[in-house]
Design a protein with these regions (language model features):
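A structural signal for multi-pass alpha-helical bundles of membrane permease subunits
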Residues: 19-303
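Short, Lys/Arg-rich, polar N-terminal cytosolic tail immediately upstream
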Residues: 1-15
Length: 303
């Protein structure tokens, strides 16, 4: 009998109770997290006339893509009501385009401005540096709703209501978390490369653009993803500053769709179909940049 056969016959040690409890807790958290998401998808796939009859079912009784066709404009309001819909309508394509433009502008401007400010706080010396950085940190402690009224007054005086500029402006210049996060990364970079570039006659802007930024892809991707998800889901500010149909983003369009009740109640299957479509760009962004975020967290933990 070989040692391999002996090892194969030895019984495996049972998992400790702590491990079982940890797995049970993870399973419960996973169910709490994914349960509502599955109900959204299940309702989106349910036939409008079968929703109330099979509300307690975990699987759609009559799976169909009809609700997605209705949301995307492939079915008229009359035909929608004929199959059990409420007749509510939404210009999903226009709202999707507005959301994509709004999110792209916020990500580019916020990430770029935050990176430049973070590098200035990390490497440059100028009067009032500590006071300004303390103000940036203090901005993270203020609830966003506190700034809505002054921002709205400013946007109104500039004539930017119902415009993309009015929606983007409050998010474009500063993000306290992004500046703090990137500053901490820039401080961890060795100065040798920057000093070598400085000896070669490079300006601070050239060093930042050609030396620092290529080394900062992972934290920049993290900031871009977090700011992109926040901008994609932003509702309150676009709702108060740009409620017009031509400038509505997806969260505002979904609220408008829900508030339409030609048949006396919201169109839940259509609303869930629209919500499912709204989730897809966020999931795509997570699939593309998720690995970068994990690398950034691992790097921060290692430091």
């Amino acid at each position: 009998m070989t040692s391999t056969d002996t090892a194969a016959r030895l019984p495996r040690a049972p998992l400790p109770w702590g491990r079982w409890l940890a797995w049970a807790a993870l399973g419960a958290m996973l169910a709490i997290t994914l349960g509502p998401l599955w109900l959204v998808v299940k309702t989106a796939l349910e036939h409008p006339q079968a929703l109330l009859a099979h509300a307690a079912s975990l699987l759609p009784a009559e799976p169909t893509l009809l609700n997605f066709r209705r949301v995307l404009g492939g079915v008229s309001a009359e035909a929608s009501m004929a199959v059990g819909g409420s007749g509510a309508e939404v210009n999903f394509a226009r709202a999707l385009g507005n959301s994509l433009l709004f999110t792209t502008l916020v990500v580019l401007l916020q990430t770029g401005n935050s990176a430049m400010a973070a590098y200035a706080f990390a490497r440059l010396q100028f009067p009032g540096k500590r006071v300004l950085f303390a103000a940036v940190l203090g901005s993270m402690m203020l609830p966003g709703v506190v700034l809505f009224i002054p921002n709205f007054i400013l946007i109104k005086q500039l004539g930017w209501l119902n415009s993309m500029a009015g929606m983007v402006a409050p998010f474009a210049l500063i993000s306290g978390f992004s500046i703090f996060f990137l500053r901490q990364f820039f401080l961890s970079l060795p100065r040798d490369l920057e000093e070598a570039a400085l000896l070669d006659g490079a300006t601070p802007w050239c060093i930042f653009r050609r030396v620092v930024l290529p080394l900062s892809v992972t934290p920049l991707a993290t900031v871009a993803m977090l700011s992109g998800i926040a901008a994609w889901n932003e509702f309150f500010w676009p709702f108060i500053v740009a409620p017009g149909e031509d400038s509505q983003v997806l969260p505002v369009a979904l609220q408008h769709f829900k508030s339409q009740t030609p048949q006396g109640q919201p169109d839940w299957t259509g609303l869930m179909a629209a919500a499912t479509l709204t989730l897809l760009p966020t999931l795509a962004l997570l699939a593309v940049l998720g690995r970068r975020v994990v690398e950034s967290v691992q790097y921060s933990g290692g430091k």
